[in-house]
Each structure stands twice: as C-alpha cells, then as structure tokens.
Amino acid sequence: MNINPFANVSLQDYLEIVQIVDSTFPIGSFNHSFGMENYLREDTVTDDKGYEEWQEAYLASQFKYGEGLVIKLVYDAMATDNLEQVWHYDKVLTVSTQARETRQGTKMIAKQMLRLIQRLHAIPVLDDYQSKIRKGEVFGNPAIVFALYVFNKGLGCSEAIALYGYSVISTMVQNAVRAIPLGQFAGQEIVLRSFSQLEKMTQEIQELDASYLGANTPGLELAQMKHETQVFRLFMS
C-alpha cells in the first residue's frame, strides 16, 4: 500500500468515511450472522478459537470473492464511467448467493445504507442506484454502495477494500461476543489478529477478475441455508 494512502482525501472526507464503516452505523448488520449461528447450533463453533476459524474461512471465501472483489470491480468500472457494468456486478453477486435469507439480508442492509448516506450526503450516483433498486432493475449490495460512496470521496481501491473489510470484521465479532458468548477482550484480540489476513486478501483481490465474482465455499452456504429453518435463533440470517 502507499505510504500515505489517504493523501488525496481531506480530513473531513476521511472522517465521513470512518462514520460509515463504524459498527454503530445503523444499517442492520447486527441482525445477521451469515450462517455463523448455525455453526453455534451444531456445536461446531463453541468458543473464541472456533469462531476465529469460522471467520477466517468466511473472509477467505465469501468476503474475498464477494464483497471484497466487487469493490475492486466497481472501482475498475467507475474509472471508465461504466455504470452499466456496476449494475451487472450487482446482479451477478446477488444471484450467486444461494441462501435466501442471506440474499434478503444483504439487500436490506444495502437499502438502509443507501437511505442513511443519501440523507447525510446526497451523492448523485447513489441516487441512480437507489432509483434502480426501487424500480427492480437491480437488487442492492452494501459493498457496491460503499464502493460508489468512497470512490466519490477519492479513496484508493485497496484502502476501500481494507476499510470495508474492517467494518465486516468488527460487526461479526460484536455479533459473536453476544451470541457465543465471547469476552470483549477476546473479541478485540480476534479483530487485531484478523488485520494480517485482511491486508493479504486486499492485495490478492487486486489480481482477480470478474470471473471469480460470487465464488463461495459450500460449507458456508449450506450453513446459511440450514439457518433458515433453525427454530431458536438471535439473527435473521
């Protein structure tokens, strides 16, 4: 990464980006475990070690080839002002998600993120995205919302992937803290240890093309599907 990756971003813009990636930004992510709760139900994840193994697998597959990669692809498309390609990636990533609740949860988070960002900042390209979602022409994905937002702010692609990844990790760990449960300190240790994986993945994503978009690990998808019929649960997905 650059020595100063935020050199072209004003302090005001940087703080506005930080606000969006903060785990307290109310977009509903805390309602979703994306299959982790099924691993709890089946006693596959029972403690901090088990959770960390699950998170590493999630980041290395569903995040890397999904939300992480789509941020890179959106940046590539926006460099040539190709919004039609962005809308195409929205459709590919959505239809590649096998679990119904995960698809629905992702769309709900995207809509809420769009609603909040537009109330705060009113960015034209996000107006276009919001309009297409309302018309049913695209589905909505929070990583695409974020990518369009930070591209508009002048943030670099690698930094965008890393910051979005941090937001995902932070939220998932907080969900694990209350669901497993984990201690707050154990949770923060997991967040810290995840940074090396996130940095490595950010670099690897730069070498991927659109043919990888939506690839996933069957075990994660099956857990997300089984969660849909789980009787007792804390999370919507």
From Swiss-Prot:
Cellular location(s): Cytoplasm
InterPro entries: UreF, UreF_sf
Disulfide cross-links: none
Alphabetical keyword list: Chaperone, Cytoplasm, Nickel insertion
Broad class of where this protein is predominantly found: cytoplasm
Subunit structure: UreD, UreF and UreG form a complex that acts as a GTP-hydrolysis-dependent molecular chaperone, activating the urease apoprotein by helping to assemble the nickel containing metallocenter of UreC. The UreE protein probably delivers the nickel.
HAMAP family linked to this entry: UreF
Protein name: Urease accessory protein UreF
Organism this protein belongs to: Streptococcus salivarius (strain 57.I)
